[in-house]
Amino acid sequence: MSQSVESRTRIKSERYESGVIPYAKMGYWDADYVIKETDILALFRITPQPGVDPIEASAAIAGESSTATWTVVWTDLLTACDLYRAKAYRVDPVPNVADQYFAYIAYDIDLFEEGSIANLTASIIGNVFGFKAVKALRLEDMRMPVAYLKTFQGPATGLIVERERMDKFGRPFLGATVKPKLGLSGKNYGRVVYEGLKGGLDFLKDDENINSQPFMRWRERFLYSMEGVNKASASAGEIKGHYLNVTAATMEDMYERAEFSKEVGSIICMIDLVIGYTAIQSMAIWARKHDMILHLHRAGNSTYSRQKNHGMNFRVICKWMRMAGVDHIHAGTVVGKLEGDPLMIKGFYNTLLESETDINLPQGLFFAQNWASLRKVVPVASGGIHAGQMHQLLDYLGDDVVLQFGGGTIGHPDGIQAGATANRVALESMVMARNEGRNYVAEGPQILRDAAKTCGPLQTALDLWKDISFNYTSTDTADFVETPTANI
């Protein structure tokens, strides 16, 4: 028996009247929404178009990143639409900025495929960033529920196992990127690796854009690099490594290169962020299976993470990459040549290293996060750093980091090995001073000068680079406090 007209009318309600109605009226705004433990939460910075109410703009973002389209569709009635609609539940004005708002949005966990960064991002950063109702949109932070995190592998190796494997404790790891990054022959490339490791570094590294070019094919680079690693390890009596970049055009090529890196004895391989989320997860699974450390270079991230009003904050990338399963990720230096506000970088490092984080608005952490026992990712600091900044680096970044001195090693006038030695002595003298209870931050320059009295390479480095720094105001700074961005 067919439904009566009266019954159909009751079911339709105002929400399902045909045509275009506001997103907030369609159910994508709910100021009284009670957050579930299993909800995925997102915090967007929105800049509505003139005349667009911020609540309606927030509801539109919630709708377009979950189930909505531009008009009412009756097929919503065939779904558990009240459950599957994302709900914007809170809108706050951004402090000290006109016409920008923080929009809090909750998503039911069943909107997302288990263990898939690609599926998560297809919704959260999909079509919404081109939506006309907002002039600009930025994803600032997310909270992943424990139930969702448990569907991800997490870091292939993790900080604790990496320290055990490297037999390095109580200090940062030391590394360097081979320079020039492009153009060297395989034999010369391998010699750079050897000299850096022989001088005292723990790691040498391929750069993001060295893959398999005419001047040096990948297999040649791998063989010569590992020859340098093995000779330096035997000479120093220490475990050392070189990040072999396996980034390639296809997954088949990447697996081939990764397999070869394992065959020739490497303990670590490397990929670039630009290969995409599915490829990153695939390589992390491979690395876990083959007992390899997996380094991720964040190549390309600043195209969408640097501008404050549009794109995506790097802390979100940190969260996704911890879920995806990388062991290292470049996360800023504070004092180097690349973008890096001190508080923002502290938030990045805490996201990668802590088992649980609380809300910390000065660091940009809008949600408390329990990491469900996923392993820790080692942050990497690289780009424009040198031995004379060692006290600042140790103060800002702590022990659980890889300090990579590329130009600060290879640019040493007495040679690569001397540059590496300068960095190793600078680090060990600073760690010793700290462990003795000295105020190593205030006394840092004097500690370095004292160490240089018995280390010629360090004295040369201090004379050459002195207090060189890159004092530019960061574009991505805290919204809730003023922070220094100069290298002081």
Swiss-Prot record:
Binds 1 Mg(2+) ion per subunit. The keyword Transcription does not apply. Keywords: Calvin cycle, Carbon dioxide fixation, Chloroplast, Lyase, Magnesium, Metal-binding, Monooxygenase, Oxidoreductase, Photorespiration, Photosynthesis, Plastid. The active site is at 179 (proton acceptor), 297 (proton acceptor). Its cofactor is Mg(2+). The modification N6-carboxylysine is found at residue 205. Mg(2+) binds at residues 205, 207-208. One of its GO terms (biological process) is reductive pentose-phosphate cycle. GO terms for molecular function: magnesium ion binding; monooxygenase activity; ribulose-bisphosphate carboxylase activity. It comes from the Eukaryota. It catalyses: 2 (2R)-3-phosphoglycerate + 2 H(+) = D-ribulose 1,5-bisphosphate + CO2 + H2O; D-ribulose 1,5-bisphosphate + O2 = 2-phosphoglycolate + (2R)-3-phosphoglycerate + 2 H(+). NCBIfam families: PRK04208.1. RuBisCO catalyzes two reactions: the carboxylation of D-ribulose 1,5-bisphosphate, the primary event in carbon dioxide fixation, as well as the oxidative fragmentation of the pentose substrate in the photorespiration process. Both reactions occur simultaneously and in competition at the same active site. This is Ribulose bisphosphate carboxylase large chain. It comes from Pyropia dentata.
